[in-house]
A protein has these predicted regions:
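Signature for phosphate-centric chemistry
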Residues: 1-117, 123-353
Length: 353
């Protein structure tokens, strides 16, 4: 998780200069799972492993604990809202807002005297707006409301509630997709730019080759089997694959390719559309399953406040000892994907810029 900097790490304003303007650009804070996906697929896989008295697990006890962990993190995300800021994420942005004021208090005092205003913007993604709301909360509390009402009126408010002070700016802050978070579509130059980037991610041969090299790296195969072997039997793991007679789980209610929609237990899809899974997602290899488990492990670190009571989970146990190296391998894989898709990427391309 994000570690707040100490005041001693702030850089000083150069001699003979004075601060006239400041801007803070931030990604959303710690969040829960973006959708019912990793937990959904591992639930389906675990249901198969639990057949015949947990025959697919190394022991019934290990199987029951694994299932409880997955069910618990699902319940925590249903309670918090899939894709929404976690309690930890809210605290992070409150702290950023507080430190912005503390660092530049003189600037804001002068702004208040001159009748200047603060401009707030959001990509329109709910967790981004929620992050901004918490930033403003921290800023306003630290400044005793000095500029709480001195806000530039947004042309397109992010929402009608706490996000009413945030101007929804998808062109700048959500430029990578043609579909905006609210379901509208980009037009004109913004749409063309998003389409070029999406085409790059989907069809660029250089990008595909680079990512294939990462996927096929022997370290990924080894780490995936090592991780899963703590939980599942070798025979069960050998049954996963695309060959005839092997198993694939799709993110549907029964795990089949054309099964019904798969929604998290206890969720209300009318209020949380992300609580229902994308049927195209699947587990078709050990690596798929291992990466899903790793993704639960890393999101758990962002959900410490939600990891309590009836939905207490522990994914750290699967990445202890020699398996800490497995975690490093999976982290390398995700970092490589971001490097190639989001930049700098490979030499000679310019879409990520």
């Amino acid at each position: 998780p994000y570690v707040a900097p100490a005041s001693t790490s702030y850089s000083a304003i150069p001699n003979r200069y004075h601060l006239a303007y400041t801007e803070s650009v931030a990604r959303h804070g710690s969040r829960g799972l973006s959708s019912y996906k990793y937990d959904a697929l591992l639930t389906l896989m675990a249901q198969s492993a639990a057949e015949n008295n947990y025959a697919g697990f190394v022991s019934p006890e290990v199987g029951k604990e694994f299932i409880n962990n997955v069910n618990a993190i699902t319940a925590a995300n249903v309670g918090n809202g899939y894709g929404m800021l976690s309690g930890q994420g809210a605290i992070q942005h409150q702290g950023i807002g507080e430190r912005i004021y503390q660092r530049d208090a003189d600037l804001f005092a002068n702004a208040a005297k001159q009748g200047l205003r603060v401009s707030y913007q959001s990509s329109g993604e709910p967790r981004a707006t929620e992050s901004g709301e918490n930033f403003k909360l921290g800023f306003d509390q630290a400044s005793n409301g000095l500029l709480a009402n001195a806000v530039v009126a947004p042309n397109n408010p992010a929402d009608n509630n706490s996000g009413k002070d945030f101007d929804k700016n998808t062109t700048t802050l959500y430029f990578h997709k043609t579909d905006n978070p609210d379901g509208t579509q980009k037009t004109g130059e913004a749409k063309e730019r998003a389409e070029r980037y999406q085409q790059f991610v989907a069809n660029d041969e250089g990008l595909a080759e680079a990512e294939e090299n990462v996927t096929n790296d022997p370290s990924m195969t080894t780490a995936s089997h090592n991780l899963l072997s703590q939980i599942f039997t070798d025979d069960f793991l050998a049954s996963i694959g695309k060959e005839e007679g092997q198993r694939i789980w799709y993110n549907t209610a029964d795990g089949t390719k054309k099964g019904a929609a798969n929604c998290a237990a206890g969720a209300d899809p009318a209020k949380d559309a992300n609580a229902c899974g994308d049927a195209k997602k699947k587990i078709a290899s050990e690596q798929d399953a291992a990466m899903d488990l790793y993704n639960l492990y890393i999101i758990a670190a962002d959900m410490e406040q939600e990891n309590t009571g009836s939905h207490t989970f522990n994914f750290d146990q699967y990445f202890q000892g020699q398996h800490a190296q497995d975690a490093k391998t999976f982290a390398w894989s995700l970092d490589a994907e971001d490097f190639y898709e989001k930049g700098p990427s490979y030499a000679g391309q310019d879409e990520t810029y």
